[in-house]
From Swiss-Prot:
Name of this chain's protein: Ion-translocating oxidoreductase complex subunit D
Lineage summary: Bacteria, Pseudomonadati, Pseudomonadota, Gammaproteobacteria, Enterobacterales
Predominant localisation class: membrane
Key words of the record: Cell inner membrane, Cell membrane, Electron transport, Flavoprotein, FMN, Membrane, Phosphoprotein, Translocase, Transmembrane, Transmembrane helix, Transport
Residue ranges crossing the lipid bilayer per the database entry: 20-40, 42-62, 69-91, 123-143, 215-235, 242-262, 267-287, 301-321, 322-342
Cofactor(s) needed: FMN
Signal peptide: none
Positions where FMN phosphoryl threonine occurs in the chain: 187
């Protein structure tokens, strides 16, 4: 009998990084389709720009670091970073914004720390926050869903808007944001926060066209449900674990329910929190990043719950309408501490 001597690890996971990343990209297709349906071609163009920028930036840095370009690009991590950033920004944002944000995410937030597996913060959310802080007007200029939009740009006008800022007829973002009621539109969360500050009641706000006949805003609830479908696919394929999305969504729902129960005149309802903004995208595609999330099961539950609390606090009392990106980055900071106190006890040893 011949014995083969080998070093650890003695058990192997057949699912490579590239396969997991590819599964996440596939799972994102329903969300991308929904955003394209309700907000136009801009989402697809932003994804293409972000993907090209991510791959080029990654290749340049890898070449400078004298590492294999082909092998690293084939793990699809750069592609996924670009995709997540692209679907997070307004579809008609200027082309240079997605290029700048994606380049910052890849070069500064990922490669500067040593590349995949070394970055402490989610690169896509770093890129998003940099853009949001630097260009708040452009980053909050979402088009109204086609159902309540007075004007919807076609494919060519979308390209012109992204690269020139104007349509063929001379229209600009101000014109395209006008809804059927003749008023400039914003996202449901942004509308809710802005209207409350203006002294409007929740009952009045819910009569706005953006909420007409919808639980959490026209179009946005379907976009979130589409991302939920993709998230369920990831759970089914075991590409992610259930702990983070479940604890995040339950905690966000609990905080929203308690807040709405005690102050229904000033705080948003649970369904608005769960089915608007980037809730489902954050729960299944961003918070579950294996590099920047907690690595223990108890830690994942704590990590997700912490992010849920932070999202509710930022949305309810902060200066930004949607707090997913900030919540993710703040939760990333706590990961080493969470992992330290939730690491499993070594078999045969007592807790020290």
């Amino acid at each position: 009998m011949v014995f083969r001597i080998a070093s650890s690890p003695y058990t192997h996971n057949q699912r490579q990084t590239s396969r997991i990343m590819l599964l996440v990209v596939i799972a994102a297709l329903p969300g991308i389709a929904a955003q394209t349906w309700f907000f136009g071609w801009g989402t697809l163009f932003q994804i293409v720009l972000a993907a090209i920028t991510a791959l080029v930036a990654e290749a340049i840095v890898l070449r400078l670091r004298k590492q294999s370009v082909a092998s690293h690009l084939q793990d699809y991590s750069a592609l996924l970073t670009g995709l997540l950033l692209a679907v997070s920004i307004p579809p008609l944002a200027p082309w240079w914004m997605v290029v700048l944000g994606t380049g910052f995410a890849i070069i500064i937030a990922k490669q500067l720390y040593g590349g995949l597996g070394q970055n402490p913060f989610n690169p896509a959310m770093i890129g998003y926050v940099v853009l949001l802080i630097s260009f708040p007007v452009q980053m909050t200029s979402w088009l109204p869903p086609y159902e309540i939009a007075a004007t919807t740009p076609d494919m060519l006008d979308t390209l012109r808007m992204i690269f020139t800022g104007h349509t063929a007829s001379g229209g600009d973002m101000t014109l395209l944001r006008i809804g059927i009621d003749g008023i400039s539109q914003a996202t449901p969360l942004d509308t809710f926060k802005t209207s409350l500050r203006a002294g409007h009641s929740v009952e009045q706000i819910m009569q706005y066209p953006i909420y007409s006949g919808a639980l959490a805003g026209v179009g946005w609830q379907w976009v979130n449900l589409a991302w939920l479908v993709g998230g369920v696919f990831l759970l089914w394929q075991k590409a992610i674990r259930w702990h983070i999305p479940v604890s995040f969504l339950l905690t966000l729902a609990l905080c929203a329910a308690l807040g709405w129960l005690f102050s229904p005149a000033t705080l948003a309802s649970p369904q608005l929190h769960l089915l608007s903004g980037a809730t489902m995208l954050g729960a299944f595609f961003i918070l579950t990043d294996p590099v920047t999330a907690s690595t223990t099961n108890r830690g994942r539950l704590i990590f997700g719950a912490l992010a849920g609390v932070l999202v509710w606090l930022i949305r309810s009392f902060g200066g930004y309408p949607d707090g997913v990106a900030f919540a993710v980055l703040l939760a990333n900071i706590t990961v080493p501490l969470i992992d330290y106190y939730t690491r499993p006890r070594v078999y045969g040893h007592r807790k020290g």
